[in-house]
């Protein structure tokens, strides 16, 4: 199956192994190259090797939060335009507004 147009590599940062593995599996089944990372350190090293076409970020991570990672990506000229989708288990109204 050919990759989705424009998305050859998607990185997914998620500390829950089951969610991360299932999401990466689903992306690969659609012909998209995908890699999952459990923490920011692994993700940062991967971005240094290869800038992805898109990033999926969990908001709550053990070593930092997805918002801090997003700000760092936006501040770097190499990753400033990479599309980012934030994912979270937070479900209160206040969380949704933020």
What are these regions, as identified by a protein language model?
Residues 21-29:
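Charged docking surfaces used in two-component/phosphorelay signaling
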Residues 36-54:
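Acidic, metal-coordinating helix/loop segments flanking the phosphotransfer/catalytic sites
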Residues 1-11:
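Non-catalytic signal-transmission and effector/linker regions of two-component phosphorelay proteins
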Residues 62, 80, 92:
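The feature encodes the CheY-like receiver
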Residues 51-53, 78-83:
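His-Asp phosphorelay/catalytic-motif detector in bacterial-type signaling
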């Amino acid at each position: 199956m050919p990759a989705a147009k424009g998305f050859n590599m998607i990185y997914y940062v998620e500390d829950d192994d089951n969610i991360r593995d299932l999401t990466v599996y689903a992306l690969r089944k659609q012909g998209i190259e995908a890699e999952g990372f459990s923490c920011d350190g692994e993700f940062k090293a991967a971005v240094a090797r290869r800038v992805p076409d898109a990033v999926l970020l969990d908001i709550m991570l053990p070593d930092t939060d997805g918002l801090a990672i997003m700000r760092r990506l936006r501040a770097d000229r190499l990753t400033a335009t990479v599309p980012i989708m934030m994912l979270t288990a937070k479900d209160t109204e206040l969380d949704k507004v933020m």
